[in-house]
Design a protein with these regions (language model features):
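Conserved "HGTGT" condensation-loop signature of ketosynthase/thiolase-family condensing enzymes
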Residues: 1-87, 104-111, 115-253, 258-260, ...
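Oxidoreductase and adenylate-handling cofactor-binding alpha/beta cores
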Residues: 380-387
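Gly/Pro-rich active-site capping loops and adjacent beta-alpha segments
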Residues: 404
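Conserved phosphate-binding catalytic cores of ATP/NTP-utilizing and phosphoryl-transfer enzymes
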Residues: 96-104
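Internal, well-ordered alpha-helical segments in soluble enzyme and binding-protein domains
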Residues: 98, 172-176, 375-378
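Short, hydrophobic/aromatic-rich segments at coil-to-beta transitions
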Residues: 391-396
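Phosphate/diphosphate-binding loops
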Residues: 371
Length: 508
């Protein structure tokens, strides 16, 4: 006897992805990429009337063009007159957050059909700028009202952090990487080989993904060795270890209730049930975190997502962990219980992701990293993966800032054993966790916590995290050639040093 389903259960019924890579294809502006991804999602669903009947149109913040109301621009293109128009602020976590909350809205009866989409035309915009041209894309009237905003508008860094160079993700995630290497007790060379192997495995996955931007598999050495095509960005990250935002891509998902899917004529084999979603934010400023290579918020959100779905790490077959940089993937894998937090004779580390790949797309270097919208691509690909492996469970994570903001989603072609979608936001628990104070006035003895070397056009500098004798964090820098060489060839974490009044760090 078939299980009777709650007609309010939220399901993903359609996904769409678009990529414009070849020069012969006319480029599209972001709003049209979003709309076309939604059209493809409706076709994918096999149903009708989903776009025109959408209750909510939600868009992921786009950076390659500015619309006064991107959700309205998309709604007009797909013929929708929704009750709710909303757009996220900047944050790679927010596509995941919107999906998690959309599922909760549908389960609660607040909506029947919600469409979520995002798109970036960064490569086209960059090429136009390089040629001294402006994009002839649509501009909304000044009379158009701004949409509802989803997400946290706080600046990711404070004035002190900004002054000390703790600004760009591509400079901060390497600090996480070095701190993680030290915690695991890995050698410098051995660690480089391991993250190269992880990313090489990601490139293999991308080679089979028809929606991936770069589909040529690369070896570990091709990824980690600097070259003219693969410059060093910030030690230990080369260009091929960083997210690739120079893409023209769009992705979309359509989420409905079971009842709405049946009314629209969506075949049962297109349904993917959302089982659980959880979201949480770590201490906002990196300066205040207890360490640089963990994420209590992701750990807590993951715990809740597992519990609400009545599943554990061993029950998950398919993963797509947020992959802006290798440290994000590794921290995610540790916090979700997929690999050990310590390097016990190399167990679970050298083969990270070998038995169960940690990506279904190939990751943000190879599949593409369209700024805030990667997670929509990851979820769309996960839906296809689950449809092709009926009954299996998939897990997607979303990450914004500097492993700051997180969302976790669990889904399957089978309905949730709990009989309903469940959602959690354990923010109060995370906020109550210990925090570290920062002392930017400290001079004297410090212990190095992490260090990277930032490679700029004609110069290099080291960005350094240290701890004072009282345990406070103090940021520092160095342009000394010997210090920078040591940072890239030896283990400086735990080394004693001196911090001057201007933040310069010198080894004892």
């Amino acid at each position: 006897m078939a299980l009777e389903l709650d007609p309010r259960l939220p399901i993903i019924v359609g996904t769409g992805q678009i990529m414009i890579r070849d020069a012969a294809t006319e480029p599209l502006e972001p709003a049209e990429l979003m709309a076309e991804a939604l059209r493809r999602a409706e076709t994918d669903s096999g149903g009708t009337g989903l776009l025109t009947g959408a209750d909510q149109v939600l868009t992921v913040s786009e950076l390659s063009w500015r619309y006064r109301n991107p959700a309205l621009a998309v709604a007009e293109r797909i013929g929708a007159s929704p009750r709710r128009l909303a757009t996220s602020v900047v944050g790679g976590n927010l596509a995941g957050v919107m999906v998690a909350r959309a599922a909760a809205d549908i389960q609660a009866g607040a909506a029947d059909v919600i469409v979520i989409t995002g798109g970036e035309a960064t490569r086209t915009r960059s090429r136009l700028r390089k040629a001294g041209l402006e994009a002839a894309w649509s501009i909304q009237s000044d009379s158009v009202e701004s949409p509802e905003s989803i997400g946290d508008l706080r600046p990711l860094v404070n004035e002190m952090e900004s002054a000390r160079g703790v600004q760009l993700p591509v400079h901060v995630y390497p600090l996480f990487e070095v701190a993680l290497r030290a915690r695991l007790g890995l050698s410098v060379d051995g660690h480089i080989e391991r993250i190269g192997s992880l990313w090489s495995a990601f490139s293999e996955v991308a080679s089979t993904n028809l929606n991936a931007w770069l589909r040529t598999p690369l070896s570990s050495s091709e990824i980690t060795t600097p070259s003219a095509e693969n410059r060093m960005i910030a030690w230990p990250y080369t260009k091929r270890l960083c997210s690739n935002n120079q893409v023209d891509q769009g992705a979309a998902v359509i989420i409905t209730s079971v009842a709405a899917a049946e009314r629209a004529g969506v075949p049962r084999d297109r349904w993917v049930f959302l089982h659980a979603g959880a979201e949480a934010i770590d201490h906002w400023n990196v300066s205040n975190r207890v360490d640089l290579c963990s994420s209590p918020a992701l750990r807590t959100a993951g715990r809740d997502a597992y519990s609400l779905a009545e599943r554990g790490p061993d029950d998950i077959t398919h993963f797509d962990l947020y992959s802006c940089f290798p440290s994000a993937v590794q921290i995610g894998a540790i916090e979700l219980g997929l690999i050990p937090a310590t390097n016990v004779n190399g167990a679970g580390w050298g083969g990270i992701g070998a038995s169960r790949p940690l990506t279904v797309t190939g990751g943000m270097t190879f599949a593409g990293g369209p700024y805030n919208n990667y997670v929509t691509h990851g979820l769309a690909t996960m839906v296809d993966t689950l449809r092709n492996d009926a009954g299996s469970m998939g897990l997607c994570t979303a990450n914004g800032g500097y492993t700051t903001e997180h969302a976790v989603l669990l889904a399957s072609t089978e309905p949730p054993t709990a009989g309903a979608y469940r959602h959690s936001n354990p923010q109060a628990e995370v906020d109550a966790l210990p925090r570290v104070e920062c002392d930017d006035t400290w001079t004297g003895d410090v212990v190095i916590e992490s260090a990277t070397v930032v490679f700029e056009d004609v110069s290099m500098r080291s960005l350094i995290a240290t701890r004072t004798p009282e345990g406070q964090r103090a940021w520092g820098m160095s342009t000394d050639a010997d210090f920078m060489d040591a940072a890239m060839t030896t283990e400086l974490v735990g080394a004693r040093a001196q911090r001057s009044a201007n933040g310069t760090i010198a080894l004892d």
